[in-house]
Amino acid sequence: MIHRPRYHDWSWPKGKAENGEPLVAAAVREVEEETGQVITLGAPLTTQRYRLGGGQTKEVHYWVGTPMPVGDPAVRLRAPVARAPRTEIDQTTWATPAAAADMLTRRGDRRLLADVVARAREGRLATSTIIVLRPGAADPAPIDAASAAPVGGRASAPGTSASGGTASGSAPTPGPGSVPGSSSVPTVPGGPGPLAAAPAAPTPRPAPTPAMVASAAARRAAQVERASSLTAEAAAHPADPPLGRFGVRQSFDLIDLLSAFGVGRAFTSPSARARQVLAPWAAVGGGSVTLVEALGVPVGDEAGADKDADARAGRVRAFAAQRLREQAGATLLSVTGAARDLIVEEIRAYGSSAIVGASPVSLGHGQIMVAHVEQGTDGPVVVAVETHSVTTKNPAVPTRRASRRH
């Protein structure tokens, strides 16, 4: 508990989130600033709401916290924290539940204490954490200018019309087979600018012979067959694109979220994005990452996977159930595709109807679902579910500027 000389009260440590700081990162930072204790977060407690003097409502989120040793990998990932000045916090102390109930000034803080004591007496205070992560998106595939030309057409060079004549200063109507967006005004290398020339006479073409017609038809048929085979191959072997540029930035900001919950190990599906999003966290913090083949479909084996869909779903659910039964602190699951939805569905099955209603059906890119699990006499029980997102700014997405009055 902390004592604030300005208000002459005893309360729980708390504070405001900085601009762009996730709430859970703010929670562990404020506790360290005000008490010197380095903690990781467990299950959430009741959110406190009360009115301020100006009529505004203040909302404060609380979690069960566990002190961590300074050398813990989850702690090493955090930025250094400076202690709060004595003018803000002049005393900190541990107290027994009975003494704390007498010392706490606010009634809401005493309710939080009663909640924690009740959970401890019922054996529900200690929980493990399962975190499901949806990795960031891949960058959109670049558009190849060559592939933009119609199949079988012959792309014209910039500055020439489809009939082979040189363009004048005014843009002619593009002929069939011309590249969309190509310039129709030629320039002279080293010259001052666009070349304005009189239209040249079109080059006479030889009359088509039966052999030429047959050759053109054969080329056209080969192009159509090649395009069809490429389309079928792309459908049968979906690409495994890497993490996009914005997703890479999200992977660095994800470190603060994972550190707040004390994640020390991770499991990942075989997809590139699921593995790459963990790279900064694993490299800096030294966390363990285990590749689980059962959480993905090997590229090139999609047809066989469709025939074995029920068996694959059963393996994914069994994997999730095994993680729920473990008392291993905080575990991260980085999964893409249908396997992630199956894991979320399995986690929801271990909670009450209220938990199911509060838990998300799907996750956004860079978002995590945090499930807090207690081990009951009849097996694991999900007692709380929360979602958090990285606050990475995407410069590629234009922001809406506030209008100014003149």
Protein language model features and the residues they cover:
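N-terminal strand-loop-strand
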Residues: 1-12, 131, 135
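A short coil-to-beta-strand element that immediately follows conserved catalytic motifs
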Residues: 38-48, 288-295
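NUDIX/MutT-family hydrolases
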Residues: 73-120
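Generic beta-sheet signal
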Residues: 128-131, 329-338
